[in-house]
UniProtKB/Swiss-Prot annotation:
Keyword Cytoplasm among UniProt keywords: yes
Protein name: Putative ubiquitin thioesterase otu1
Biased composition (Polar residues): 115-124
Gene Ontology BP term (one): ERAD pathway
Gene Ontology cellular-component annotations: cytoplasm; cytosol; nucleus
UniProt subcellular location: Cytoplasm; Nucleus
Main subcellular localisation: cytoplasm
Organism taxonomic ancestry: Eukaryota, Fungi, Dikarya, Ascomycota, Taphrinomycotina
GO molecular function, one term: cysteine-type deubiquitinase activity
Stretches the record annotates as UBX-like: 7-89
Reactions this protein catalyses: Thiol-dependent hydrolysis of ester, thioester, amide, peptide and isopeptide bonds formed by the C-terminal Gly of ubiquitin (a 76-residue protein attached to proteins as an intracellular targeting signal)
UniProt-annotated catalytic positions: 143, 146 (nucleophile), 247, 323
Function: Hydrolase that can remove conjugated ubiquitin from proteins and may therefore play an important regulatory role at the level of protein turnover by preventing degradation. Has a role in meiosis.
Amino acid sequence: MSSLRLRLKYENQSAVETVEANATVGSFLDLVAAKFSLPRNSIALKFGFPPQDIPLVNSDVPLSTLVSSGQQILVLKNAATSFSTNEPAKPPIPNAATKPTFPPQTEISNPPAVSHQSKNTSQDPPYVSTPIGDIALRVMPDDNSCLFRALSKPLGFSPYELREIVANQVLSNPDIYSTAILGKPSIEYASWIRKETSWGGYIELSILSSHFGVEICSVDVKTGRVDSYNPQPATGQRTYIVYSGIHYDLAALAAVLWDTDVDVVLFDASDVTITPYVQQLASLLKNMHYYTDTASFSIRCTICGTGLVGEKDATAHALATGHTQFGEY
């Protein structure tokens, strides 16, 4: 690792900083003090959930032994724990979300008002604000692989590799993934899902969440409903995707709206405080008409040109003809 990218949050200010991998706690503290014009000896640094102190007693300790790139660091002033001698914080789970102090659940039953217009650019993605950053929509290309693209970042595999995992699981578990479940023999389904033109859905979500030991929460734009796949994940991690009827996108905790490199996309599955904000994002998208009514939308098979109405017709057409490329019209 050549450097660490960290999001700093102090009161209503935030910044993303890149520091060398061999940077010490002391040099990082100097950077924070200069960035926010704070006296060095009045600063406390915290990360994780529940928030844990970054020990500041030994300024020569490499920062990389305490935090990971992409994490958020809470900067506090005049904190009693500024120079705590408590046990060093435990290293974070790789790729897990940093979730500093959230209000109690009772305080966020009605999350803050939606923010969706950036003061910097009109091209920022839709987002809602939370106490620790913005939950932003990361839009996937509309290319029939949106589900696999949305899951590629949190799961760490390419869309092609995710399709292969699904196909192999289907073939390896014929008793679970029967013709009745798949709508076709497992061999045919495995061949079909390997194609870039084939849409993924609940079967793929079920398989991938179980395979990776991650809870996948799919939030429906039209209804706000949250469908949870693998709600007791082995890794203790959760990711959120947003479903608009025929399309999947990823919801991320964004350090910078226009920079996806430091997005947080894996969260502690035991903590539900993020969920209401993702639902609020879905509500914002609904108000923007960012959804398709799958029962009545008009769709055309782009292979043969047949006009169809609704998901039911599209599914029947795909099963009857093998055509799996559709577009709205």
